[in-house]
Each structure stands twice: as C-alpha cells, then as structure tokens.
C-alpha cells in the first residue's frame, strides 16, 4: 500500500474531505490555502485563494458544485468548485471551526468559537444553487447558541433531521435541525476532554467521535446510544468509518506541544485500524512525522487519506489483502 504524498501546504493540515464521488480530495491547513486534488494520482487541480487566516474546516456539496470553508479570519466562504471563484462570504464575530453541508446540500452549518464575550454557536445558512450561486442569504436561518459548553464539531444526521454536536466538555448533543431545540445530551467522553472530530456513516444513522481522552465512540444518531468504544493509547484528533469493510480508522498522536525529541514510533503518529464490530485494533499505518490531525475515507471504501501536523496529506489506495482480511466468524457468516 504505497501512499501518494501530497505536498501543497506549508503548515499543518486541519481537515481533509473527499467529495461524494471520491474522485476529488479537498484539504485545508493553517496556511490560508485550500487545495483540490485528484484522488487517483494525487495531482493538484488547483487552489481556492482568499482567506486571511488559518483555514480550520472544509466541506463540499453533495453534487460537488460548491465548496465551503471556515477560517480563523472569522468568515465562511463559499466557492465555485469548478472555477475557483469565491461566490459568497459570511462574516462571524469569532473564528469558524467546522462547516458541513446538509445531506441534500440545501443548507450549511457553521460552528463558531467562544471568544471575546461571544458564546459558541452553530449557525445554519440556506444555500441557493440558482443564478450562478450569486443570491445567497445574508443571515443564518437558524442559530443554536451553546450556553453550557461550546461546540467544537457538528454534523447532520440522516435526512438532515438532527444536528449532532460534539462539545469541549466531552459531551454530545442532538438538536432538532428545524427548530434548534436541544433534544438529547450525553456525556460520551471523559469530562473536560474535548471532542475533536465527528464523522458519520454513509447513511448518517450513526457516527464516530474522536476525543482527547484517547478513545473513539460509535454512537447512534437517533438516540445518542453509545454502540461501541475504541480505546487507543494516545489522544485522538480524528476518526472515520470505512464503507465496504467493517472498520474504523483513528488518527492522533501526542499533541504537538508535548512532543519533545521523540521518535515517530514513540509519538504514536500512526493511523490505527480497528474492527468496527469487535473493537479490536487490527493494524496501523505509519508514515507521518507528527500527529495525524485529520483522516478521511473514500466513499467507495477503496482508499483513505490522512493529513498531519507535518504539512503532508497521504493518500493510501487499499490493496487486495485489506479487502480479503476477515475474522473467522465473518467467514462462517459468508459460508452460510
């Protein structure tokens, strides 16, 4: 499994995202640059320029027509994927830490930072695909304010029914996506260990969280029941669920500030594969020289990518043994 090394960033990666077809990969980092890559060969398609601060987050619409980015310059920008032009800028009072399109692409959520007297909030923006994308709404159609603990990450559940948010205090909440009312709140991780990532299954009925408390949890979108727990030996920055095979991929490593002159092995800078059902670790992929900040998987389950503190994105296309590997019980199930 030889990785394709994508070097288009000068500073550490913050998020990577495959589009729905899996032919494109978008990456953002702390150097203000947004890159688009071909997944198959790692060739860079181009960049989206305009942000004035670190770009924390990126998402691409389900039809790969629009790209959204959120940045430390307190703005969300909407880009035309094909031409690279910025079609809309929304200004916020604080930095934007996470953006995500709803499953039908008609709305975009933005998670804003708690700072300078402003409470953390989740804003929902309505997205229009008419008139060359020029007439976007100026104000959010819904704003959810986090009075208790600020939201660090958020996403949409199945059919865009709920907004699921992970918080700084390790809890996960479920909000009604129409009204913004909080329906559920579960202390999924150790108290005060923030949730660094939330990624959904393909049908969005369950999701995985990655936390500073060195664990990842598989949680149901409907009632926030904790289904599985994956325990690692290092703080986790990102986690994703693989289609095709029942695995999850976790990425982490010692926080950059805690790393002294450790070797890559000691820093535990590897992508870890766990069995989704049995919760066992089944393998690791080394390569990054520094913690993994973000992992993403190809929607067909044929490849995965990781973005590190070292400024590189590594794309791995899976080999045959990856797909052939099975537990004995899984084999027996196949025979029946």
Swiss-Prot record:
It is found in: Cytoplasm. Keywords: Cytoplasm, Initiation factor, Protein biosynthesis, Repeat, WD repeat. Transmembrane segments: none annotated. One of its GO terms (molecular function) is translation initiation factor activity. One of its GO terms (biological process) is formation of cytoplasmic translation initiation complex. SUPFAM superfamilies: WD40 repeat-like. Pfam families: EIF3I (PF24805). InterPro entries: eIF3i, WD40/YVTN_repeat-like_dom_sf, WD40_repeat_CS, WD40_repeat_dom_sf, WD40_rpt. PROSITE patterns: WD_REPEATS_1 (PS00678), WD_REPEATS_2 (PS50082), WD_REPEATS_REGION (PS50294). It comes from the Eukaryota. WD repeats lie at residues 8-47, 50-91, 146-185, 190-229, 287-326. GO terms for cellular component: eukaryotic 43S preinitiation complex; eukaryotic 48S preinitiation complex; eukaryotic translation initiation factor 3 complex, eIF3e; eukaryotic translation initiation factor 3 complex, eIF3m; nuclear periphery. Belongs to the eIF-3 subunit I family. PANTHER family: EUKARYOTIC TRANSLATION INITIATION FACTOR 3 SUBUNIT I. Component of the eukaryotic translation initiation factor 3 (eIF-3) complex, which is involved in protein synthesis of a specialized repertoire of mRNAs and, together with other initiation factors, stimulates binding of mRNA and methionyl-tRNAi to the 40S ribosome. The eIF-3 complex specifically targets and initiates translation of a subset of mRNAs involved in cell proliferation. Component of the eukaryotic translation initiation factor 3 (eIF-3) complex. This is Eukaryotic translation initiation factor 3 subunit I.
